[in-house]
């Protein structure tokens, strides 16, 4: 509700001890909220800023980006994080739409719009058992697309088997734990990081 957004904004700003306050919009898909929601958020931030600098960053899968969104981000100097897992075969191996369709082309269209409007963007890339096997192609893809900042998040997903036969991801502390097929093995993760470091440091 508007009341909850206002209360959160006021209390969050009041709780900060620095002159710069960062709002991070992340979790689920934040672009499912309307632009009007974020306009309201900006208005409330200014109302309660008290002379502090307010910055915003939003993490999105990029598939819902439009010219209107990108104009909003550009005008208000938002940093946009894009969730993209490398070249098309890597990304589409696991990142499918709700309808089970590949999503890479839509994400790349979103990145193109961000560039068109001069929006600062970076990438958050999930490293899984599939794309960890070709780290240089993975890294070079981001360089070629003008990504200045890149964050790697390795998948290590624990599974437990329940008595009814279902296997579910969990934070279980039982002995009968296995990892999902997408999980990166320790040696694989180490190889991935070392290969990219050797390329980057040159």
Stretches found by the model and what they are:
Residues 1-10, 30-80, 84-90, 97-113, ...:
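Canonical radical SAM enzyme core domain
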Residues 1-9, 17, 181, 188, ...:
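Short intrinsically disordered, low-complexity coil segments enriched in acidic
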Residues 13-18, 116-118:
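Glycine-rich phosphate/diphosphate-binding loops that line cofactor/substrate pockets in enzymes
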Residues 15-21, 49-54, 202:
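Short helix-terminating capping/connector loops at secondary-structure junctions
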Residues 17-31:
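Active-site groove signature of glycoside hydrolases
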Residues 18, 75-76, 145:
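Structured loop/turn residues at beta-strand edges in well-structured enzyme cores
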Residues 20-24, 53-57, 79-81, 120-124, ...:
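Structural preference for beta-strand elements that scaffold enzyme active sites
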Residues 94-105, 112-202:
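Radical SAM enzyme [4Fe-4S]-AdoMet core and its adjacent flexible, acidic
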């Amino acid at each position: 509700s508007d009341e909850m957004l206002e209360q959160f904004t006021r209390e969050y700003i009041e709780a900060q001890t620095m002159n710069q306050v960062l709002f991070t919009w992340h979790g689920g898909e934040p672009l499912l909220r309307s632009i009007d929601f974020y306009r309201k958020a900006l208005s409330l931030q200014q109302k309660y800023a008290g002379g502090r600098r307010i910055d915003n960053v939003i993490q999105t899968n990029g598939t819902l980006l439009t010219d209107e969104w990108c104009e909003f981000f550009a005008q208000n100097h938002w940093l946009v994080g894009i969730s993209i897992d490398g070249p098309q075969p890597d990304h589409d191996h696991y990142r499918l739409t709700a309808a089970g369709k590949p999503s890479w082309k839509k994400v790349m269209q979103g990145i193109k719009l961000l560039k068109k409007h001069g929006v600062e963007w970076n990438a958050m890339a999930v490293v899984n058992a599939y794309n960890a096997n070709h780290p240089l192609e993975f890294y070079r893809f981001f360089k070629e697309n003008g990504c200045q900042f890149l964050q790697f998040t390795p998948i290590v997903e624990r599974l437990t088997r329940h008595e009814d036969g279902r296997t579910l991801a969990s934070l279980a502390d039982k002995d009968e734990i296995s990892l999902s097929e997408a999980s990166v093995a320790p040696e694989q993760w180490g190889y991935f990081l070392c290969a990219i470091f050797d390329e980057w440091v040159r």
